[in-house]
């Protein structure tokens, strides 16, 4: 099954301000019917990067079988980690960056790698807040306001 996932994460007062994430999942079943699922949540103290990662994690966790997933995100942090293979280097170096400093959010990166396992995932960067119809800013702002 092919799934399209649109994700966004945000935090106000970054770091350690309120934040949230939003995810919209789309797939078309065999009869041609479009199915959509929306997920969002807010947190009292977080960072924008943690929320960007959590959006992808929660989206993948919502899938109940192995899928081909295209993730659209405005987070260069998330997209480049895979498309530029930063993550491969981090893992090889024991979760250290090329400058030998520790990678931030290791717990989230490890969880993301774990939930990606049954799926074929590709990441596509989209410009944020540029009128993209599936941009999840609304969800992330609402989720942050709830906290």
Map each language-model feature to its residues.
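Small-residue (primarily alanine) positions within well-ordered alpha-helices
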Residues: 55, 59, 143-144
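RNase H catalytic domain
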Residues: 10-16, 57-137
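RNase H-like nuclease fold core
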Residues: 1-50, 54, 61-67
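Single conserved hydrophobic/aromatic residue that forms the stacking wall/gate
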Residues: 139-147
């Amino acid at each position: 099954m092919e799934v399209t996932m649109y994700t966004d994460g945000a935090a106000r007062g970054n770091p350690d301000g309120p934040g949230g994430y939003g995810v919209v999942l789309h797939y078309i079943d065999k009869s041609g019917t479009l199915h959509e699922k929306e997920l969002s949540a807010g947190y009292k103290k977080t960072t924008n990067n943690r929320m960007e990662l959590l959006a992808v994690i929660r989206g993948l966790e919502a899938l109940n079988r192995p899928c081909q997933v295209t993730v659209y995100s405005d987070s260069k942090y998330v997209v480049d980690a895979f498309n530029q293979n930063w993550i491969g280097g981090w893992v090889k170096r024991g979760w250290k960056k090329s400058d030998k400093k520790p990678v931030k959010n290791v717990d989230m990166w490890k969880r993301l790698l774990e939930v990606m396992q049954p799926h074929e995932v590709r990441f596509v960067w989209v410009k944020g807040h540029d009128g993209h119809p599936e941009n999840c800013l609304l969800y992330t702002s609402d989720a942050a306001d709830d906290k």
